[in-house]
């Protein structure tokens, strides 16, 4: 909206307004607007959800310390989605198809997560949608979008797999790229969902990964930098910086209320939608493998669950006291704030490692 207004109206009166069209300026405005919207509506949503008794449902087999969280409102992801959508609508070039691809995942996965949260509240149970139903809708949404993206760009570079540390090894996946992209979107969505188990644990790594993807989008949008690092030049990728900036701003505002002890939780409406959003951004940038590194904290959490289930079914014993792994550390007596901050540090380090791989390639 701001981009269109400047290009078509304000620039006619003075060339000074052209600064508004600059990507860096719009990214800053996107960040600030999402931050202040999140801060502005956060307290209102907390009060409203308190009055409606939209409280977090705590697992009966979880750590005993979590019983005090039962009076904490959930579904705070609505704040995140609203903040991101409004700021992106204001700051982004809405003629860019990538913006609408991301919106599609953000909103549809948000609706899916909202449905799951509402069912949990109605049932007064930690189980909302069945795993089968949730996975079906996640898959249908992701496959629909991925096929549209695949059909709209049939160039050779569109199905290349960029492998970290290897400069000239870019295998062509062809139609198999659809399944890779699908796996990245659905997998990231579920991985973030699994990681959202402690106050502020998931939102900070989400911001870190969004910042890393913003750097990659900036490089991909510059033909000289992209050529220098031997990664695809993607002319539409600039607007993804606006979206990533909005995610960071909205996340920072949400963290104001979500930090320990949390006043509100993001719920599935937040974790599923933001996880899927990070996944689709990585797909649009052709950096699926890089996301595995930068989002390594989410990968670790997911692997801990997979290993726990497989090992228990094979041997009848558990590797961890409880999965995901952050609960294991809780049950071992580690204070919740310490676990959270240490996971943040690990996540930040992995984002830096991911960005370094863009340069260290043979």
From Swiss-Prot:
Pathway entry: Cell wall biogenesis; peptidoglycan biosynthesis
UniProt GO MF annotations: metal ion binding; phospho-N-acetylmuramoyl-pentapeptide-transferase activity; UDP-N-acetylmuramoyl-L-alanyl-D-glutamyl-meso-2,6-diaminopimelyl-D-alanyl-D-alanine:undecaprenyl-phosphate transferase activity
Any Pfam family matching the protein: Glycos_transf_4
NCBIfam families assigned: mraY (TIGR00445)
Ranges that cross the membrane: 28-48, 72-92, 94-114, 131-151, 169-189, 200-220, 236-256, 264-284, 290-310, 339-359
HAMAP family per UniProt: MraY
Keyword rRNA processing on entry: no
Lineage of origin: Bacteria, Pseudomonadati, Pseudomonadota, Gammaproteobacteria, Enterobacterales
Keywords linked to the UniProt accession: Cell cycle, Cell division, Cell inner membrane, Cell membrane, Cell shape, Cell wall biogenesis/degradation, Magnesium, Membrane, Metal-binding, Peptidoglycan synthesis, Transferase, Transmembrane, Transmembrane helix
Membrane topology value: Multi-pass membrane protein
Role played: Catalyzes the initial step of the lipid cycle reactions in the biosynthesis of the cell wall peptidoglycan: transfers peptidoglycan precursor phospho-MurNAc-pentapeptide from UDP-MurNAc-pentapeptide onto the lipid carrier undecaprenyl phosphate, yielding undecaprenyl-pyrophosphoryl-MurNAc-pentapeptide, known as lipid I.
GO cellular-component term (any): plasma membrane
E.C. number: 2.7.8.13
Gene name for this UniProt entry: mraY
Compartment annotation: Cell inner membrane
InterPro entries tied to this protein: Glycosyl_transferase_4, PNAcMuramoyl-5peptid_Trfase, PNAcMuramoyl-5peptid_Trfase_CS
Family: Belongs to the glycosyltransferase 4 family. MraY subfamily.
Names of required cofactors: Mg(2+)
Domain of life of the organism encoding this protein: Bacteria
Catalytic activity field: UDP-N-acetyl-alpha-D-muramoyl-L-alanyl-gamma-D-glutamyl-meso-2,6-diaminopimeloyl-D-alanyl-D-alanine + di-trans,octa-cis-undecaprenyl phosphate = di-trans,octa-cis-undecaprenyl diphospho-N-acetyl-alpha-D-muramoyl-L-alanyl-D-glutamyl-meso-2,6-diaminopimeloyl-D-alanyl-D-alanine + UMP
PANTHER family listed in its UniProt record: PHOSPHO-N-ACETYLMURAMOYL-PENTAPEPTIDE-TRANSFERASE, PHOSPHO-N-ACETYLMURAMOYL-PENTAPEPTIDE-TRANSFERASE HOMOLOG
Stated name of the protein: Phospho-N-acetylmuramoyl-pentapeptide-transferase
Chief location bin: membrane
GO biological process, one term: cell wall organization
């Amino acid at each position: 909206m701001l981009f269109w207004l400047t290009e078509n109206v304000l620039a006619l009166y003075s060339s000074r307004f052209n600064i508004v069209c600059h990507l860096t300026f719009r990214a800053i405005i996107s960040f600030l607007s999402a931050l202040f919207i999140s801060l502005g509506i956060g307290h209102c949503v907390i009060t409203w959800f308190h009055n409606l008794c939209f409280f977090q449902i705590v697992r009966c087999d979880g750590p005993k310390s979590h019983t005090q969280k039962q009076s904490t409102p959930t579904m705070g992801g609505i704040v995140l989605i609203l903040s991101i959508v409004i700021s992106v609508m204001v700051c982004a070039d809405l003629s860019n198809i990538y913006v609408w691809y991301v919106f599609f995942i953000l909103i549809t996965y948000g609706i899916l997560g909202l449905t799951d949260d509402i069912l949990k509240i109605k049932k007064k149970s930690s189980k909302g949608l069945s795993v089968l139903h949730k996975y079906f809708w996640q898959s249908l949404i992701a496959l629909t979008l991925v096929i549209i993206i695949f059909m709209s760009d049939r160039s050779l570079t569109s199905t290349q797999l960029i492998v970290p540390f290897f400069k000239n090894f870019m295998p062509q996946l062809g139609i198999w790229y659809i399944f890779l992209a699908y796996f990245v979107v659905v997998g990231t969505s579920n991985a973030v969902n699994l990681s959202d188990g402690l106050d502020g644990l998931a939102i900070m790594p989400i911001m870190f990964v969004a910042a890393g993807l913003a750097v990659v989008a900036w490089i991909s949008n510059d033909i000289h930098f992209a050529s220098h690092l031997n990664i695809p030049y993607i002319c539409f990728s600039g607007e993804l910086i606006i979206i990533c900036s909005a995610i960071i701003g909205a996340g920072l505002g949400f963290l104001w209320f979500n930090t320990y002890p949390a006043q509100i939780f993001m719920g599935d409406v937040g974790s599923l939608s933001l996880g899927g959003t990070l996944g689709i951004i990585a797909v649009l940038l052709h950096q699926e493998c890089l996301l595995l590194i930068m989002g390594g904290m989410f990968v670790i959490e997911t692997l801990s669950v997979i290993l726990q289930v497989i090992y228990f079914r094979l041997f009848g014993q558990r590797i961890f006291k409880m999965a995901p792994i952050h609960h294991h550390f809780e049950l071992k007596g580690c204070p919740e704030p310490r676990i959270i901050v240490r996971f943040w540090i690990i996540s930040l380090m992995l984002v830096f490692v991911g960005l370094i791989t863009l340069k260290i390639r043979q």
